[in-house]
């Protein structure tokens, strides 16, 4: 199998090579490119541009079109995979994305050419779940409001939720819409606080 990888400032070429090494057979070959700028700040702006629909306007690494001509598998992170690139790879069987979103990949073109596209939706799921818990605590305990008031010399005593007793987490019922990788982690973390959890997910018969 011929594998072509395109790393970047976030998922580097070294990371890709090290990650693939345990799974390679003796007949597998790997060609690795580096996409974009080594500065993550620059790449963050480029990612936003790609996600906003600018996929076709970004140049891919030199030599990538030639490399995919006989490739079986293409692995990318932020590098755009356009219709033109897919059509230059007649033997391509699958495109794997190291990120959750697929905005940088022309999924429709891949589908038309019978190329499987897979992503990694759980790669930052725990970070998102932790951030969600943080927001719940900040909102219910008025942490941000208190901080803002103190910075402005005010000792605030009332908040939007002080009309009734402010509930502790253990007394809360929390509804979660969507029970995928992130939803499950949020539910688990909330259960440690003692919350009652209600879940709604149209894709699951029973949660």
What are these model-predicted stretches?
Residues 1-116:
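An N-terminal-biased, well-structured beta-alpha scaffold segment characteristic
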Residues 13, 40, 104-105, 127, ...:
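Generic structural signal for helix capping and beta-alpha/helix-loop junctions
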Residues 14, 83-87, 130, 144, ...:
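Alpha-helical elements of the RecA-like P-loop NTPase motor core of helicases
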Residues 83, 125-126, 205:
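Positions that flank functional sites
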Residues 100, 122, 180-184:
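Glycine-rich NAD(P) Rossmann-fold beta1-alpha1 loop
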Residues 113, 121-173, 185-188:
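Phosphate-binding beta-alpha-beta segment of Rossmann-like dinucleotide-binding domains, i.e.
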Residues 162-207:
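Rossmann-like dinucleotide/phosphate-binding beta-alpha-beta segment
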């Amino acid at each position: 199998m011929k594998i072509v990888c395109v790393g970047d400032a976030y998922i580097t070429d070294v990371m890709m090579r090290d990650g693939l090494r345990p799974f390679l057979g003796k007949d597998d070959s790997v060609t690795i490119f580096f996409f974009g700028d080594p500065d993550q700040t620059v790449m963050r702006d480029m990612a936003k541009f790609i996600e906003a629909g600018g996929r076709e306007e970004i140049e891919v690494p030199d030599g990538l079109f030639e490399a995919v001509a006989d490739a079986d598998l293409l692995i990318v992170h932020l590098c755009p995979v356009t219709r033109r690139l897919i059509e230059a790879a007649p033997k391509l069987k699958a495109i794997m994305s190291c990120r959750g979103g697929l905005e940088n990949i022309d999924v429709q073109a891949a589908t038309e050419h019978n190329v499987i596209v897979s992503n990694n939706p759980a790669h930052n799921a725990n970070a998102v779940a932790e951030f969600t818990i943080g927001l719940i605590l900040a909102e219910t305990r008025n942490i941000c409001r208190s901080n803002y008031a103190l910075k402005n010399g005010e000792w605030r005593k009332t908040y939007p939720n002080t009309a009734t007793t402010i509930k502790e987490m253990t007394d809360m019922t929390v509804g979660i819409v969507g029970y995928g990788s992130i939803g499950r982690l949020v539910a688990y973390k909330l259960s440690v606080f003692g919350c009652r959890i209600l879940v709604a997910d149209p894709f699951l018969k029973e949660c």
